[in-house]
Amino acid sequence: MAPENFTRVTEFILTGVSSCPELQIPLFLVFLVLYGLTMAGNLGIITLTSVDSRLQTPMYFFLQHLALINLGNSTVIAPKMLINFLVKKKTTSFYECATQLGGFLFFIVSEVIMLALMAYDRYVAICNPLLYMVVVSRRLCLLLVSLTYLYGFSTAIVVSSYVFSVSYCSSNIINHFYCDNVPLLALSCSDTYLPETVVFISAATNVVGSLIIVLVSYFNIVLSILKICSSEGRKKAFSTCASHMMAVTIFYGTLLFMYVQPRSNHSLDTDDKMASVFYTLVIPMLNPLIYSLRNKDVKTALQRFMTNLCYSFKTM
């Protein structure tokens, strides 16, 4: 229990990616470039899937929302992180910290579910191509995406409420570059068993549950591809899901390393911070590249968009 006489924490201090003063400006420039590329890439995907009529399919509808989620996830983290590289006292208020944690949880949970939906979409497209447009209808897509955001929001509210229901009255130094569950609970001066349990169950349920959907979908996809007689047909079928397979492997590998571990009262180590950098900033930057460079439809749509844009400027 928390002691009777204490001063309640009103602000937190973030240690950041590195405490070395000489690295602050170089790190600022590196992460500024990362965030800039993330913004450009994901906004590009959102724009292309919105304006190009050939990309108005369920596959690209889900990709559009994945790009939106990636954009939101990095925006919750990056701006504050960049500011902290330039200031000596890296403080964040209690409510600002709670808002950042809630926003991060909303987007990361939504991304986990969205990747599972995209795997199911690829499963139907390859295993049941004749029924694809009937099964994965526009109405169903809207419903699934809406439920994804609703579930992400509900999870964020519940988990962040439990994390901030405990007392913070001793140290206020968060060993991280943003407000996250594990380093926050390590600072609490009250019993953290319940919030730690909620965090662990939520993370394990979301990651393992969605991972099962992904694995089952791709197991059936592989079986269907192996049944295709021609090598050209197998190559074409594989190419439709290769980008998503790569994105899923990178994302789940990093997330499993980070979150599916026994409860601990210890704050994050350097490896955990690097994993956090990877899935909050690097993966949102990589996804547009993965889905565009390995996708003929997206590359063709980009060429059409740039051609039309250049033509519009010439006729002005």
Swiss-Prot record:
InterPro entries: GPCR_Rhodpsn, GPCR_Rhodpsn_7TM, Olfact_rcpt. The keyword Glycoprotein applies. SUPFAM superfamilies: Family A G protein-coupled receptor-like. It is found in: Cell membrane. Disulfide bonds join 97-189. Keywords: Cell membrane, Disulfide bond, G-protein coupled receptor, Glycoprotein, Membrane, Olfaction, Receptor, Sensory transduction, Transducer, Transmembrane, Transmembrane helix. Pfam families: 7tm_4 (PF13853). The chain crosses the membrane at residues 26-46, 55-75, 100-120, 140-160, 198-217, 238-258, 273-293. Residues 47-54, 121-139, 218-237, 294-316 are cytoplasmic. Residues 1-25, 76-99, 161-197, 259-272 are extracellular. Glycans are attached at residue 5. It is a multi-pass membrane protein. GO terms for cellular component: plasma membrane. Coiled coil: none annotated. GO terms for molecular function: G protein-coupled receptor activity; olfactory receptor activity. Odorant receptor. Belongs to the G-protein coupled receptor 1 family. This is Olfactory receptor 8J1. The lineage of its organism: Eukaryota, Metazoa, Chordata, Craniata, Vertebrata.
